[in-house]
C-alpha cells in the first residue's frame, strides 16, 4: 500500500482542533499509517509553542498534543523518515524545477522527502505546496 505523505500544516489538525480537523481525521483513518519527515517533529513543536505564546492554546494543551504525537510515532502510526543531504539536494532541484510555484524552503524539503518515499499523495493545508505537488504528479489533498 502506498502511504500518503503528511506535512505539518495538515498533521497539526490531528492534534489541535481547528478548521479542517474533522476532514483530516477522516482522511488519516483511511490508512494504517502515514509518512512524515523528521522535520515535522521540529515544525510541530514550533507550531504548538507559537500557538501557546499567542494564547490560542494553553501550555497543558501544547504539551499534551506533543505527547500524543510522540505516542503516535512510538506506536508506528506515523512513519518518520530522516531528512538527509539527498533530500536537501532534492529540494534544491525542486525549487529549480518548480519556478512558477513560490515554494518555501521547508515545503520544498517536505516534497523532496515525499518523492523519496514514493508517496503518491501529499496531505497539506498549504495551497502553494498542494499546487507544487500536483505539478510533480503527486495527488494533493488539502485541509483547511
Language model features with spans:
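Short, well-structured N-terminal submotif of metal-dependent ribonuclease cores
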Residues: 1-42, 47, 51-64, 136-138
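A generic local structural motif
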Residues: 20-22, 67, 108-111
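Active-site-proximal, substrate-binding regions of enzyme catalytic domains
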Residues: 45-94, 135
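Active-site neighborhoods of divalent-metal-dependent phosphate/nucleic-acid chemistry enzymes
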Residues: 75-131
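Short acidic-hydrophobic, aromatic-tinged amphipathic segments that line or gate anion-handling sites
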Residues: 80-83, 140-144
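C-terminal binding/interaction regions
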Residues: 127, 136-141
Amino acid at each position: 500500500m502506498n502511504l500518503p505523505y503528511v506535512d505539518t500544516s495538515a498533521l497539526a489538525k490531528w492534534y489541535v482542533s481547528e478548521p479542517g480537523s474533522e476532514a483530516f481525521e477522516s482522511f488519516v483513518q483511511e490508512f494504517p499509517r502515514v509518512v512524515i519527515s523528521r522535520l515535522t517533529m521540529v515544525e510541530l513543536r514550533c507550531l504548538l509553542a507559537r500557538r501557546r505564546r499567542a494564547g490560542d492554546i494553553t501550555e497543558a494543551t501544547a504539551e499534551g498534543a506533543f505527547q500524543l504525537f510522540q505516542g503516535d510515532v512510538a506506536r508506528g502510526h506515523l512513519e518518520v523518515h530522516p531528512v538527509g543531504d539527498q533530500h536537501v539536494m532534492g529540494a534544491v532541484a525542486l525549487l529549480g524545477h518548480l519556478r512558477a510555484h513560490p515554494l518555501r524552503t521547508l515545503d520544498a524539503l517536505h516534497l523532496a522527502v515525499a518523492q523519496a518515499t514514493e508517496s503518491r499523495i501529499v496531505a497539506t493545508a498549504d495551497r502553494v505546496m498542494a499546487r507544487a505537488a500536483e505539478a510533480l504528479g503527486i495527488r494533493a489533498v488539502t485541509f483547511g
